[in-house]
């Protein structure tokens, strides 16, 4: 049922969204098969939104598809604080830098691939105060490059999935499970399992008891404090002669070579070993 409502100002709209019981349907990326429909209530999507006076003058570069989980979460962070959004999605490197400078962007959230596509750079951008990375594994070399482009920015990572939304914030190169929901996670054979109470609704979910297999492999930094690092996606491991090879770790080593800006490691079928590793380097 659609209800027509008139609001006296934007503050009233924000308040209505805060109290909304509406649901939003989004789809998984489909990188591991057919895209799956997931339904989230607005409150779940705003789980990580921060409110307050310190956030009201932010200017966000909008680098995600607005129909995806990450795009929705950046939208709500900006919208709920009445921030200005600058569309840099699918823009060229030159256009992105021009928009950052012209609009005096203060905050950015994007994938590591997006930031790598900003390289090389010709000048620095002093207005950017925070840079967030998510959706893919990052590396030290990229952090260093981002730090040079945006010298006044704090850099952090975020973990979010279409199935669950934002769950963890970064502490350095690690993530921390909040104490309040630490009992909602299990680790089985290095894979992160998420309790169904933290997920959206989908007919495609398959549970192991009350838990959902995220497909993310992790390693503990400090188990007692809920600190961990992501290693890779479970389905990304490549079988080479009976050994499970992590392409992300191989890419990390290649990226440490001077002059290398991007690296993509993948498996290619081989009649003797099953697969051999291949790398494309820029």
Q: Where are the language model's segments positioned?
A:
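Conserved AMP-binding/adenylation subdomain of ANL enzymes
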Residues: 46-59, 67-107
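Short beta-strand->loop structural element characteristic of the AMP-binding/adenylate-forming
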Residues: 1-8, 36-39, 83-91
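AMP-binding/adenylate-forming catalytic core of the ANL superfamily
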Residues: 215-282
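Conserved AMP-binding A3 loop
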Residues: 23-50
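ANL superfamily adenylate-forming
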Residues: 1-20, 34, 131
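Conserved ATP/PPi-binding loop(s) of AMP-dependent carboxylate-activating enzymes
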Residues: 187-219, 225-227, 243-245
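Conserved pre-ATP/AMP-binding loop-to-beta segment of ANL
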Residues: 9-27, 54-60
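Gly/Ser/Thr-rich phosphate-binding loop
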Residues: 107, 119-175
């Amino acid at each position: 049922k659609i209800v027509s409502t008139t609001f006296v100002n934007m503050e009233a709209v924000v308040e209505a969204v805060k109290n909304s019981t509406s649901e939003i349907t989004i789809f998984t990326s489909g990188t591991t098969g057919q895209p799956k429909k997931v339904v989230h209530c607005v409150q779940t999507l705003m789980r990580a939104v921060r409110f307050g006076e310190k956030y009201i003058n932010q200017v966000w570069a909008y680098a995600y598809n607005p129909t995806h989980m990450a795009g929705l979460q950046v939208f709500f962070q900006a919208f709920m604080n009445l921030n200005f959004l600058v569309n840099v999605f699918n823009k060229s490197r030159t256009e992105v830098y021009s928009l950052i400078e012209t609009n005096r962007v203060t905050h950015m959230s994007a994938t590591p691939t997006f930031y790598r596509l900003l390289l090389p750079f010709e000048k620095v951008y002093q207005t950017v105060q925070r840079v967030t990375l998510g959706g893919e594994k990052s590396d030290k070399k990229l952090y260093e490059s981002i730090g040079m482009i945006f010298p006044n920015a704090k850099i952090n990572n975020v973990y979010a999935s279409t199935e669950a939304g934002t769950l963890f914030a970064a502490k350095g190169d690690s993530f921390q499970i909040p104490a309040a929901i630490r009992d909602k996670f299990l680790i089985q054979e290095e894979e992160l399992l998420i309790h169904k109470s933290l997920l959206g609704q989908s007919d495609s979910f398959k549970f192991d008891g009350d838990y959902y297999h995220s497909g993310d492999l992790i390693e503990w930094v400090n188990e007692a404090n809920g600190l961990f690092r992501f290693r890779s996606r479970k389905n990304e491991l490549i079988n080479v002669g009976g050994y499970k090879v992590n392409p992300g770790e191989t890419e990390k080593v290649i990226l440490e070579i001077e002059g290398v800006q991007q690296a993509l490691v993948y498996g290619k079928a081989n009649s003797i070993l099953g697969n051999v590793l291949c790398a494309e380097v820029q």
